[in-house]
């Protein structure tokens, strides 16, 4: 049996790779594998398929003899935050993060509020194999009610991270991308005193992430300029990521957020060994400038679970990804886009500086180009020998190195594509090398796939 888990749980197109039956069995498997009788916390984003999958998972949990509590539509970080605070035995978030509406996913958390480790993934898959003959009709339909009191604990927790600080007088635009951030992002900023303009704020599972949010910044850039705002923040579908935009439309991605936030902690002498954690996607300009001010950047594979593992190992206080997924000790590394946004806003207010000026004081990024090579197969589902051959092919291209030039290639953990990152000091070299590698790699992968 091929693993159903990718870099961030289980993900796929609803009713094709991710079915009602699979969700039911995952709920059952988690229920069987939990070590306590405390309820399992479940939530979802706004996708149309979300409620169907919630019903399947909750029935599976009940079939295993365990109870669940339904949080409703919520940001993903609400699940691990509340697991830790309220002592749930585990949690499930139904979301495909930044992916289009037809996708959905299952993110699973253990009783510590952490993404489950490989050992538990294997245990769940083993239970799934033995649960193939489990009959859905044996179990009655489950009553599903939202728990608003728990959600309020989460939002109050975010507000409390600000202490006595506020955002009075700040004009801020938020793009909630028809997703989880629609539940609370605007109200949290308003309670902190900000003058808020919010766009794409309907809970619409057919529009989630479409031409909006952290992967499409044109709408928020336009709204910032039209409203003469100080800054803006654009979230992804489940609000665990955020990208900032200054008053002139310049983008503050995860690298910039890590550098600016990290530098504040460095100056306050709070960073363990002056270290922050990022991934192999992090910009060389970021790393080189961070080193110049006395910092150490530790890189991991792409994925917040790898960042979290490195944070624990290095005893770091801050880590994240260029995509805007930031993990901070402030909320026990729950990876919360709304938390990141209010903290960045707080620093600007506290320092009496515009986000534009703060960005200018950071680093000059090297030009990067990220290209996707479409695969006619899912990398994780192919035979081991083919996988090794493709990995060798990828490695041969990844080893292309010149002065101040970097190539990083990886299979997507959520989509049937290879992601090719090329980085160099000038755009011409980036474009030339990217075109060459993409063409050659596409040809080789196509030839390999014809032998399947």
Curated annotation (Swiss-Prot):
Residues with PTM Phosphoserine: 97
PTM comment: Activated by phosphorylation.
Enzyme class (EC, first level): isomerase
Catalytic reaction(s) noted: alpha-D-glucosamine 1-phosphate = D-glucosamine 6-phosphate
Superkingdom of origin organism: Bacteria
Positions annotated to bind Mg(2+): 97, 236, 238, 240
Key words, A-Z: Isomerase, Magnesium, Metal-binding, Phosphoprotein
Keyword Phosphoprotein: yes
Record GO biological process: carbohydrate metabolic process; peptidoglycan biosynthetic process; UDP-N-acetylglucosamine biosynthetic process
GO CC field: cytosol
Cofactor binding note of this UniProt entry: Binds 1 Mg(2+) ion per subunit.
SUPFAM superfamilies listed in its UniProt record: Phosphoglucomutase, C-terminal domain (SSF55957), Phosphoglucomutase, first 3 domains (SSF53738)
PROSITE patterns, sorted: PGM_PMM
EC number(s) from the headed UniProt entry: 5.4.2.10
Active site: 97 (phosphoserine intermediate)
Cofactor list: Mg(2+)
CDD domains listed in its UniProt record: GlmM (cd05802)
GO terms of molecular function: magnesium ion binding; phosphoglucosamine mutase activity; phosphomannomutase activity
Family: Belongs to the phosphohexose mutase family.
Free-text function comment from the UniProt entry: Catalyzes the conversion of glucosamine-6-phosphate to glucosamine-1-phosphate.
Name the record gives this protein: Phosphoglucosamine mutase
UniProt gene name: glmM
